[in-house]
Amino acid sequence: GLQRDKMKLGILKEPEGEMRVPIVPNSIPKLVKAGLEVIVENGAGDLANHSDSEYESKGAKIVTRGDVLNCEALISINPPNLDDIREGCILMCVADPFRNPDVVNKSISRGITLISMDMIPRRLSRAQSMDVNSSQDNLSGYKAVLLGASHVPKGIPMMTTSAGTVKPAKFVVMGRG
């Protein structure tokens, strides 16, 4: 049969201040095994403590932003500047289309296939592994407790020591998710 070139999946570096990455190095081997060539923008994982060499050791290729933007498919947390994305590209990101209809409209006008990862249904069991909202909400809730705990003048857990017992702090959790 005919040998088909591997689809190139580009991982973009996020804007300043964003510490998450769309794909961690440990996920690269699965993508390569599925037949993708994974291309990572140099420094994409720096703020998440994932070095370029870590991505390379898992099978990704490290290149410049310009080279990543030439990939057939791109993945990022935040929508990149759509003027930089070529026509026909598949862009996967957290587009938040109801708050950012301009991202949807510009994608359509530029011929970009937009897959808004935050719009994948949460209730379908076969789609749960792709549910970015649950994982991010879980991490946000965990971090909220840690940040809140850093402002509490008492110990968080009850502790019984030879010097006595320290009563635990009390919390009120507002909201749900």
Feature names for model-found ranges:
Residues 3-110:
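An N-terminal-biased, well-structured beta-alpha scaffold segment characteristic
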Residues 5-8, 82-170:
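Glycine/serine-rich phosphate-binding loop and adjoining beta1-alpha1 elements at the start
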Residues 174-177:
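Glycine-rich Rossmann-fold phosphate-binding loop(s) that bind the pyrophosphate
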